[in-house]
Each structure stands twice: as C-alpha cells, then as structure tokens.
C-alpha cells in the first residue's frame, strides 16, 4: 500500500512541477516582444516527496538587437535590446511539458485505480 501512495505522491508532484513549467513557458511566450525580457528556464530537483520545481534561472543568451529608430528605448543608432525568447523553442518545450504532465496524470490514475481495487478486495 505504501508503494501505491508513493506512486500517487510522485505523480502528483510531477504534475505540479510540469504545471509550473508550463506557467513559466507561457510567461516567456507572452513576453516574447517585451524589450529587455530574459527567458525563464525551469529546473527540477528530486526531493523526498518526488520531483519539484527548482530555482528558476534566467537565460543569459544575448537579446536580439532590434532596429526601430522611432522606439522610445532606441539608442542613437536606432537599436534597442529585444527579448531572448525563441518562440519555436518555447512551443516545443510547452509540448514536452504537456506530454510529461499527461504521463504523470496517467500514472496517478493507474495508481488510484489500483488502490481502489485493493480497498474493494479488503472490504469483501
């Protein structure tokens, strides 16, 4: 029984971590056109209760230089720092996070069904 509860806990923590990862990815996508925005990178750590979201890092890649002389942030040459968000990468990461979430959900559901079957057997 403890193993089933561990599986439930691990799957639930995995779903929580992937949900937070999706949140950070959606923030990156929403701010892709925000000047000076740095992409957030989610990290994970293994804890006693399963997986958890680790510290969020900022991507240190250089931001794209955008030429727009009329922009309020433009320097004398008409350039300003855009964001370092790559939408293709963010969408691929979001798809991966969604699939990881769904896999954890299936594990959670299977463990729940197994524990329910065990309880039904004990009641007989």
Predicted regions and their residues:
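Amphipathic alpha-helical polymerization modules
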Residues: 1-124
